[in-house]
Amino acid sequence: MLFLACECPYLDELDRAQLRKTTSSHLTADMLTGLWQCYYPMYVGNVEFKEVRMFSSGKADIIMEDVGGSAYYAETFKWRWDGNYITFTKGNTTYQFQVTDCIFPELFLSDSRRKYPWAWRRPEDCIK
């Protein structure tokens, strides 16, 4: 994936914010809305999370791929932030990740299996 420079009014603020290390207790749901993408393969159960778009309405679209690459698809989940954990639920399926570190706009998540680095991805109108 290639990111090129673009003119977005809040990019300077994001650049300054990126230098600020914070704890999960300083994160708000508003800071979590938007499009997130995993730096490295994020295998959760039998799927790989590719990216997650979290909406302020409490819904999240998760783009995932079956392990082995046999299917690539998106599913809509409900999401919530309790100050320590991001939880995605759909029917009987629940994914829960603890925010172990944050250097905004980067998040580091973990579950019982491993740690996952995520990074903020710019809005589509800033991606060329």
Write out the residue ranges for each language-model feature.
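Lipid interaction determinants
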Residues: 7-74, 80-128
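C-terminal motif of bacterial Sec signal peptides marking the signal peptidase cleavage site
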Residues: 2-5
